[in-house]
UniProtKB/Swiss-Prot annotation:
Active site, per annotation: C47 (cysteine sulfenic acid (-soh) intermediate), D140 (for phospholipase activity)
Catalytic function, reaction form: a hydroperoxide + 2 glutathione = an alcohol + glutathione disulfide + H2O; a 1,2-diacyl-sn-glycero-3-phosphocholine + H2O = a 1-acyl-sn-glycero-3-phosphocholine + a fatty acid + H(+); a 1-acyl-sn-glycero-3-phosphocholine + an acyl-CoA = a 1,2-diacyl-sn-glycero-3-phosphocholine + CoA; 1-hexadecanoyl-sn-glycero-3-phosphocholine + hexadecanoyl-CoA = 1,2-dihexadecanoyl-sn-glycero-3-phosphocholine + CoA
List of residues that carry Phosphothreonine: T44, T177
Cited Gene3D superfamilies: Antioxidant, Horf6, Chain A, domain2, Glutaredoxin
Description of post-translational modifications: Irreversibly inactivated by overoxidation of Cys-47 to sulfinic acid (Cys-SO(2)H) and sulfonic acid (Cys-SO(3)H) forms upon oxidative stress.
Protein name (Swiss-Prot/TrEMBL): Peroxiredoxin-6
PROSITE patterns membership: THIOREDOXIN_2
CDD domains: PRX_1cys
Positions carrying Phosphotyrosine: Y89
Record key words, sorted: Acetylation, Antioxidant, Cytoplasm, Hydrolase, Lipid degradation, Lipid metabolism, Lysosome, Multifunctional enzyme, Oxidoreductase, Peroxidase, Phosphoprotein, Redox-active center, Transferase
Taxonomic lineage of the native organism: Eukaryota, Metazoa, Chordata, Craniata, Vertebrata
Naturally occurring in which organism (per UniProt): Sus scrofa
InterPro entries recorded: AhpC/TSA, Peroxiredoxin_AhpC-typ, Peroxiredoxin_C, PRX_1cys, Thioredoxin-like_sf, Thioredoxin_domain
Protein family: Belongs to the peroxiredoxin family. Prx6 subfamily.
Length: 224
């Protein structure tokens, strides 16, 4: 795919038409964290379940200062009409608004710039549609995480929320989150922190797992 973003790249300050009007991306983000996520097409089954779950979790993202914005190659008019279906799927009033805007990228200009097109999935005209991409940007507008799923596999938005919590925690504290970590679980002390400094940084205690190598790199501490 042409285009695309690498970790640490700054988000392009694009302009786009959305379900809340025309936006400039950096102005939309402000000082918040941001999630930009694309889907293949409106009025399709997997996408409806995905955006339905994203809408359900929107309050959890909002209370963590995260702004959400979706994107596909459909028009604003289609986005608004489809939003009724998404709300109905969630068992709510079938209104045209969601807790986040959706970008109209009929031209595919943004999808090309951001490397979002799936060459294996095409529309009725034989043109590629957007894959299931997730970009997470920090308050500095730089890319902190990217996820790329094919059209046939829906994403787990609870996992995306878990990742946001980890990213925000590790941006503030000198820790890392281990496999299958959940909010409130113990975290790992970074291996470049000397033992004496670790004791001062983590007053709740540092617990080291003894290993056959004798190396003391598996160090846990309660979540700060």
């Amino acid at each position: 795919m042409p285009g695309g973003l690498l970790l640490g790249d700054e988000a392009p300050n694009f302009e786009a038409n959305t379900t809340i009007g025309r936006i400039r991306f950096h102005d939309f983000l402000g000082d918040s964290w941001g999630i930009l996520f694309s889907h293949p097409r409106d009025f399709t089954p997997v996408c409806t379940t995905e955006l339905g779950r994203a809408a359900k979790l929107a309050p959890e993202f909002a209370k963590r200062n995260v702004k959400m914005i979706a994107l596909s190659i459909d028009s604003v008019e289609d986005h608004l009409a489809w939003s009724k279906d998404i709300n109905a799927y969630n068992g709510e009033e079938p209104k045209e608004t969601l807790p986040f805007p959706i970008i109209d990228d009929k031209s595919r200009d943004l999808a090309i710039q951001l490397g979002m097109l799936d060459p294996a999935e095409k529309d009725e005209q034989g043109m590629p549609v957007t894959a299931r991409v997730v970009f997470i940007f920090g308050p500095d507008k730089k890319l902190k995480l990217s996820i790329l799923y094919p059209a046939t596999t829906g994403r787990n938005f609870d996992e995306i929320l878990r990742v946001i919590i980890s990213l925000q925690l590790t941006a503030e504290k000198r820790v890392a989150t281990p496999v299958d970590w959940k909010n409130g679980d113990s975290v790992m002390v970074l291996p470049n922190i000397p033992e004496e400094e670790a004791k001062k940084l983590f007053p709740k205690g540092v617990f080291t797992k003894e290993l056959p190598s004798g190396k003391k790199y598996l160090r846990y501490t309660p979540q700060p």
